[in-house]
């Protein structure tokens, strides 16, 4: 089992990683929800099936893919944070 200081350091690293993910996710969401953009889930074609004019479809698809990856990774990091925080509380209780 890691020492309390090591556990705290790992928690700080995980928290910083999660914050970076949240920052990138917010930037992507802002780009995709600008006026004229399709958003995170909107259609990329019009009612007739043609691509939406003035929208870089490759960029939108890339952003959506990256957002989905970040969302999944964020969930994993959050679970790891919860686990390590519980372990830290357990360690702190044992050392008292």
Report the location of each language-model feature.
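Intrinsically disordered, Ser/Thr/Pro/Gly-rich linkers and terminal tails that flank
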Residues: 1-96
């Amino acid at each position: 089992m890691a020492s309390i200081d090591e556990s705290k350091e790992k928690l700080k690293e995980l928290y910083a990683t999660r914050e970076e993910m949240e920052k990138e996710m917010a930037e992507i969401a802002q780009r995709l929800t600008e006026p004229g953009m399709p958003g995170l889930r909107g259609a990329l074609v019009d009612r007739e099936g043609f691509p939406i004019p003035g929208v870089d479809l490759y960029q939108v698809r890339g952003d959506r893919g990256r957002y989905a990856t970040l969302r999944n990774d964020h969930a994993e990091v959050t679970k790891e944070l919860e686990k390590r925080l519980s372990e830290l509380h357990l360690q702190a209780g044992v050392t008292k």
